[in-house]
């Protein structure tokens, strides 16, 4: 059984769609977590595997699953800058305002790392700009710290 799960994580990480489809057809448990709490969906999203992420979402993967640090797939793509995957996650019900262990949100990641297309997408879909992390900082505060002028402008318009 472990081999199937190793294969599932491999298919998600590398975008091996034929292997992924075979495993999905076998009705494998798709919300299994590895030793860091990553699910196949989190792995696919973090690695920019759009088609694999789409297949997993179609198979009802939990879009709000959190790893052991509290990070979600949406947080991962907001950090990495994968706008197309972010839109898919949101369309499948991803919670825009979930917070990880330190209180950060997807919007905070996008603001902090200059992923301004993601800032725009998250704001368009109603991300809460008033959420504060454990240090008391908002997405705007983080954008200011980084000198991220486009994000500052978008966040100040609200």
Residue ranges: model-predicted function:
Residues 19, 51-52, 84-85, 117-118, ...:
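Conserved ankyrin/ankyrin-like repeat signature
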């Amino acid at each position: 059984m472990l081999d199937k799960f190793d294969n599932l994580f491999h298919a998600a990480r590398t975008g091996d769609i034929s292997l992924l489809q075979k495993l999905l057809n076998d009705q494998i448990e798709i919300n299994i977590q590895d030793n860091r709490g990553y699910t196949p969906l989190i792995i696919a999203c973090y690695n920019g595997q759009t088609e694999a992420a789409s297949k997993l979402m179609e198979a009802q993967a939990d879009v709000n699953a959190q790893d052991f640090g509290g990070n979600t797939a949406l947080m991962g793509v907001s950090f990495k800058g994968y706008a197309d995957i972010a839109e898919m996650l949101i369309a499948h019900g991803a919670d825009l305002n979930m917070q990880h262990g330190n209180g950060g949100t997807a919007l905070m990641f996008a603001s902090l790392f200059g992923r301004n297309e993601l800032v725009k997408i998250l704001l368009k879909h109603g991300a809460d700009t008033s959420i504060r992390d454990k240090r008391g900082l908002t997405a705007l505060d983080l954008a200011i710290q980084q000198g991220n002028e486009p994000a500052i402008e978008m966040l100040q318009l609200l």
